Design a protein with these regions (language model features):
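Anionic coordination/interaction segments
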Residues: 1-166
């Protein structure tokens, strides 16, 4: 396993990784559960325009219009895109108030370290290849964040987030 893969999956448990089809918002997706337990991998999203988007399972993104010289995010190799998580693409940081009046800072999809609270991560891509959905659940906070990536001829790269109670 590469050092990059080890950084994002330090305690690899391949038995936890499963795949299945599911319906999400009325569309068919293929979901990989516990995707963070395997080495990072590269994906592409397609659309009806000249926009291209490549995204790593770490969250790093490269995208542009027509060709590499018109990149919106830096056009790098797969390993550099994977390492770019948190610098390219999206970043979510949530301040969560607890019943005892304390505040917890939660950064979904960040690299986990020993001693961090348990998280459940899933990754789903629709069968047309137009939408990619990252989901992280923090059971201790009772929260789930779903982040969807899509391309749009009109709006370009579209990232949407949905925070729900579980």
């Amino acid at each position: 396993m590469s050092s990059q893969a080890a950084a994002f999956a330090p305690h690899v448990d391949h038995s936890a990784v499963t795949g299945r089809s599911l319906d999400l918002d009325g569309r068919r997706f293929y979901q990989i559960s516990a995707y963070d337990q395997i080495p990072p991998f590269f994906m592409t999203l397609v659309g009806a325009s000249n926009l291209w988007l490549f995204i790593s399972s770490t969250g790093g993104v490269t995208a542009g219009r027509e060709h590499a010289d018109r990149a919106l995010f830096p056009y790098y190799t797969e390993d550099k895109v994977a390492e770019g998580a948190g610098r390219t693409g999206g970043l979510s940081v949530l301040r969560v108030g607890l019943p005892d009046a304390s505040v917890v800072c939660w950064q979904p999809f960040a690299e986990t370290r020993p001693g961090d609270p348990a998280v459940e991560r899933n990754l789903a891509k629709d069968y047309l290849g137009t939408t990619l959905v990252f989901t992280e659940t923090r059971a201790d906070l009772g929260l789930r964040l779903r982040v969807a990536w899509q391309t749009s001829a009109r709006y370009g790269v579209v990232r949407s987030c949905e925070l729900t109670s579980v």
